[in-house]
From Swiss-Prot:
Species whose genome carries this gene: Ralstonia pickettii (strain 12J)
Subunit annotation: Interacts with GyrB.
Protein name: DNA gyrase inhibitor YacG
Transmembrane residue ranges: none
Cofactor binding: number and manner: Binds 1 zinc ion.
Amino acid sequence: MNVKTVKCPSCGKPVPWVPESRYRPFCSERCKQIDLGAWAAEQYTIPVVEEDDLPDAPGNDTSGKLN
């Protein structure tokens, strides 16, 4: 059987993608905690698109006028 592997997001070590891999996608509890700490310290961010930057779409009129 060919087992798929993924790289641990913290250290890059290969991790077999099977139910027995307790911390997947991480290789260990330590790498899992390092990643959680990075999120808690706001080292990772999710990009936000400002509403002014969104293209105009039909039905998205925010002027308050009714058609």
